């Protein structure tokens, strides 16, 4: 959206998302192979992406306190990911993700040029992306507000109240700098 309609963007809130190729890290080797040559690598991608272990890791990450996480979250996700037709849908969606990676330089250039108010929230137990990614945003937007919370990739699973307070504070302070809530 920032490239298609930059006038619609007043601020950015990012939660465990990547805008730099380096942020994908070593875990993305199988996924990169899939993007480079889909057909011979699709089975390996599906095995990786749709497995119970990978699904669980998206929620728990490297959190040593697994009991804080509701197992229904990853078991429900795993169940729905493994319904008839979902493997094909997920493969197609994931294959398309490569277009995001191709757009990273444009996203970075836009951030460097526009310097939008930027809140980056990162789960310290994130295992899908490289832990250095939050600081990479600061290279593009030096005034970025970065917070590492006690969570994994889906940090809202365990840090919803903290994240809500961070977002509320960001919107409130950014409002004075030009970010206004839209009437709904």
Regions found by a protein language model. Give the residues of each.
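Flexible "cap/lid" subdomain of the alpha/beta-hydrolase fold that forms the substrate-access gate
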Residues: 2-147
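Catalytic active-site module of serine/aspartate enzymes centered on a nucleophile-bearing elbow/loop
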Residues: 143-184
